[in-house]
């Protein structure tokens, strides 16, 4: 790739978390029985009139503010005309010449370097239905539950130069929509998805190469792998003396390849024109001021604050702010014990382990942040060892019990009585003379063996620091 550079732009669709659809009152609930959340409007019956969802307009504007866009006080819905079985009206209601937001940007960090990625526009549109193909009865079905669900499409400038930058940008957008509460960010269910436009050009050339549009990118990993494959494919085409063809390509995650769907000659002419059934969307200045004032602290600002206020590394701050609820949990736990680095370590280790095993988010568990803060406090006070804390962490997450009362009730309080530990140390030394001689002969790693023996004798409750001190003293 040394002779070429990649040019990448992303088109990201985020399904808005409204309770009703963009132009009717049907539910947006995911997973309902097919064709149960459908009415005359979202099924495209003649003679009905759409009514815009005010909450969707607010959410789109908030997103624009979060990524430094100009929010247009007047925007226009347009009809995007094409035929597909899951599009009952024969057109999609979108925005074209006058979108709700435009001219924004988002900063990303990759390998310690900060890049500014331009955002061309954000526009509102209604989603299509879903085609379901059944091989068993050789038939295809259409589920219109998704038809009319509100989306925003976030279109970037072609400013990314690698798959890593594209994923960093996508993750940054994902964090923002989740922080704002306007989208649940679920890529598996399709509520956050993207298409990638990828081309390559000789380094130093200003003119863009011929691009391919990649579809079926339903995870961050697939976005990275698909773009990497497509860059390599286009390079092979050029090095073989052929020309890259402008086309739409589907990513096959199993084979890790992109496959041609349709070429340029098959591309749609959407024949956009303003929707005659919808008035222009007008946003009052008072609403814009109020929405901007209500914006939460956004992920990048929170990362910077965590690094300065809590002295965390950028990596730790990134992990803890990736989810708004997780960041809130961290701050509440830190407030309970005053040990931000200890809290960060425990959350990134034991807590994330438990969340991943249960496949849940932190706001779905019984443990409260005050309990985690108390756990840090009793570890630091020597009431229990870090090992005991790790052993009981799953139960604390499951039950929501406060740690100090829990360990006292279970008899897990750490032994810090020197005489009691010294007895266990003396026994371990007396029972293992060969290991004692080997240790004295230079095999100092055997201290871990003796530590294990003593922990077995004390059922894991001996103070590790005191055990180490006594062992080193007695073994010489």
UniProtKB/Swiss-Prot annotation:
Tell me which SMART domains the record gives.
GatB_Yqey (SM00845)
UniProt keyword NAD present: no
List cystine links: none
Q: Which domain of life is it from?
A: Bacteria
Q: Which reaction(s) does its UniProt entry say it catalyses?
A: L-glutamyl-tRNA(Gln) + L-glutamine + ATP + H2O = L-glutaminyl-tRNA(Gln) + L-glutamate + ADP + phosphate + H(+); L-aspartyl-tRNA(Asn) + L-glutamine + ATP + H2O = L-asparaginyl-tRNA(Asn) + L-glutamate + ADP + phosphate + 2 H(+)
Q: Which UniProt keywords apply?
A: ATP-binding, Ligase, Nucleotide-binding, Protein biosynthesis
InterPro entries the UniProt entry points to: Asn/Gln-tRNA_amidoTrfase_suB/E, Asn/Gln-tRNA_Trfase_suB/E_cat, Asn/Gln_amidotransferase, Asn/Gln_tRNA_amidoTrase-B-like, GatB, GatB_C_1, GatB_Yqey_C_2, Gln-tRNA_amidoTrfase_suB_CS
Which GO annotations describe the biological process of this protein? glutaminyl-tRNAGln biosynthesis via transamidation; translation
Q: Which Pfam families match?
A: GatB_N, GatB_Yqey
- Please give one Gene Ontology molecular function term for this protein: ATP binding
Q: Does the keyword Lipoprotein apply?
A: no
Entry's EC annotation: 6.3.5.-
List, alphabetically, the Gene3D superfamilies matched: 1.10.10.410, GatB domain, N-terminal subdomain
Q: Whom does it interact with, and what assembly results?
A: Heterotrimer of A, B and C subunits.
Q: Which family does it belong to?
A: Belongs to the GatB/GatE family. GatB subfamily.
Function as written in the Swiss-Prot or TrEMBL entry: Allows the formation of correctly charged Asn-tRNA(Asn) or Gln-tRNA(Gln) through the transamidation of misacylated Asp-tRNA(Asn) or Glu-tRNA(Gln) in organisms which lack either or both of asparaginyl-tRNA or glutaminyl-tRNA synthetases. The reaction takes place in the presence of glutamine and ATP through an activated phospho-Asp-tRNA(Asn) or phospho-Glu-tRNA(Gln).
Among NCBIfam families, the record links this protein to: gatB (TIGR00133), PRK05477.1-2 (NF004012), PRK05477.1-4 (NF004014), PRK05477.1-5 (NF004015)
What is the name listed in the Swiss-Prot or TrEMBL entry for this protein?
Aspartyl/glutamyl-tRNA(Asn/Gln) amidotransferase subunit B
The species is: Nitratidesulfovibrio vulgaris (strain DSM 19637 / Miyazaki F)
The encoding gene: gatB
């Amino acid at each position: 790739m040394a002779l070429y550079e990649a040019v990448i732009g992303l088109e990201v669709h985020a399904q808005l978390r409204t309770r009703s659809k963009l132009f009717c009152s049907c539910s947006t609930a995911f997973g309902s029985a097919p064709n149960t959340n459908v009415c005359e409007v979202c099924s495209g019956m003649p003679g009905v009139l759409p009514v815009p969802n005010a909450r969707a307009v607010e959410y789109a504007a908030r997103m624009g503010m979060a990524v430094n866009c100009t929010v247009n006080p007047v925007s226009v819905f347009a009809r995007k005309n094409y035929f597909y079985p899951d599009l009952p009206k024969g057109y999609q209601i979108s925005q074209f010449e006058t979108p709700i937001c435009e001219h924004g940007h988002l900063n990303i960090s990759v390998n310690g370097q900060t890049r500014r990625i331009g955002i061309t526009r954000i526009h509102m549109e209604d989603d299509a239905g879903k085609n379901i193909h059944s091989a068993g009865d050789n038939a295809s079905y259409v589920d219109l539950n998704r038809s009319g669900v509100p989306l925003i499409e976030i279109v970037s400038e072609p400013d990314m130069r690698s798959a890593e930058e594209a994923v960093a940008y996508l993750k940054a957008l994902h964090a923002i929509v989740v922080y704002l509460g306007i989208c649940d960010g679920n890529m598996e269910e399709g509520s956050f998805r993207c298409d990638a436009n990828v081309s390559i050009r000789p380094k130093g050339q200003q003119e863009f190469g011929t691009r391919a549009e990649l579809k079926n990118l339903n995870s961050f990993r697939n976005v990275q792998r698909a773009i990497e494959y497509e860059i390599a494919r286009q390079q092979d085409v050029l090095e073989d003396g052929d020309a890259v063809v402008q086309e739409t390509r589907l990513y096959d995650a199993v084979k890790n390849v992109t496959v041609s769907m349709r070429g340029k000659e098959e591309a749609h002419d959407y024949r956009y024109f303003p929707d005659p059934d919808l008035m222009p969307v007008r946003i009052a200045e008072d609403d814009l001021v109020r929405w901007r004032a209500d914006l939460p602290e956004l992920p990048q600002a929170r990362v910077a604050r965590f690094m300065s206020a809590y002295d965390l590394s950028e990596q730790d701050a990134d992990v803890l702010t990736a989810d708004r609820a997780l960041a809130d949990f961290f701050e509440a736990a830190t407030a309970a014990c005053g040990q931000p680095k200890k809290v960060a370590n425990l959350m990134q280790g034991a807590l994330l382990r438990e969340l991943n095993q249960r496949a849940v988010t932190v706001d779905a568990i019984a443990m409260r942040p005050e309990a985690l803060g108390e756990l840090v406090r009793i570890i630091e006070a020597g009431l229990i060892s870090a090992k005991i804390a790790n052993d009981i962490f799953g139960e604390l997450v499951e039950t929501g019990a406060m740690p100090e009362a829990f360990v006292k009730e279970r008899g897990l309080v750490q032994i810090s009585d020197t005489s009691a530990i010294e007895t266990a140390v003396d026994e371990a030394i007396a029972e293992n003379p060969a290991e004692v001689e080997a240790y004295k002969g230079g095999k100092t790693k055997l201290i871990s063996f003796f530590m294990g023996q003593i922990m077995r004798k004390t059922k894991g409750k001996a103070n590790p620091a005191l055990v180490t001190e006594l062992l080193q003293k007695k073994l010489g």
